[in-house]
């Protein structure tokens, strides 16, 4: 019972922290992404291929937090569902957009499988919604036994993203 209670308390602490991590305000988006990757790797020893360019976020908080949430949900899906041993996370910022590539070598899935579980598993729907809120594009490819790749492009023109969603 005590161990179960400890796990619940730890889950609550992690949830509260992840609502708006201190690293986000203090150190920025790059450090927040690095912290998410550390969290992903805490329980398992993934082989990690990580490249994060200077991804400072000078736009408003809404944009940055939504982008953070999208990445967070992608990484949580890997941790919860993929059974992967390797994870690739590349994030760069060009003059026009953020480019994020997240890939694993896990068990993969089919879109039919996701649609069948739509009422109980909505991680991918949350990811798509976040990308849409930022006027971005997302491409998800997955196959049973071949892992999953998520390719996200988010334009830096915040005005068009906010205008689209007003």
In which residue ranges do the predicted regions lie?
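Conserved ATP-binding N-box helix of the HATPase_c
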Residues: 64-86
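Glycine-rich GHKL/ HATPase_c ATP-binding element in histidine kinases
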Residues: 146-148
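Short beta-to-alpha transition helix within the HATPase_c
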Residues: 6, 23-44
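Conserved post-beta-strand hinge residue in the HATPase_c
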Residues: 105-107, 122
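ATP phosphate-binding glycine-rich loop and adjacent ATP-lid/helix-beta elements
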Residues: 114-144
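Conserved short strand/loop->alpha-helix "switch" segment adjacent to the catalytic nucleotide/phosphoryl-transfer site
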Residues: 49-72
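Short beta-strand/loop element within the Bergerat-fold HATPase_c
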Residues: 86-96, 103
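Conserved DHp (HisKA) dimerization/phosphotransfer helix of two-component histidine kinases, i.e.
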Residues: 1-19, 27
